[in-house]
Amino acid sequence: MAENGNKIAASDYVNAMKPTHRLGHALQKMFDQYDVLLSPVLASPPVKIGTIKMNTNDMKTYVERLTKYSPFTGIFNQSGQPSMSVPLFRTKDNLPVGSMFSAAFGDENLLFSLAGQLEQAQPWAKSLNVMREILLETI
């Protein structure tokens, strides 16, 4: 990625960012009507570390692999609106399933407040060691 980035002129970068800025403005309009958007974090249950290989220099292949597994997070990574992943559920193998909550620009406090309420209603912190052990089994 870094090598490809060095080949891009500043003017091309500015032009390439215009759709990203339009996306951010469109999402912001949605948040004028809704406080929080809920979506899954991943398109499928979590997999063990090392299952998905991102070892390619082909940017198109990299993006395809990434968006196939995680199609929901990129829009907010790109637009800059705050989001959080909360492990509210588990698979049958006890792996965490993330619920992604997103909010308007500057509404991080809303997400922190929501996270606190969700943690009280369904605590997940105690299961972190179990999750770590399961995810690291293959390393």
Set out the residue ranges of the language-model regions.
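Serine-dependent amide/ester hydrolase catalytic core
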Residues: 1-78, 130-137
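Structural helix-boundary/capping segments
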Residues: 13-18, 25, 33, 67, ...
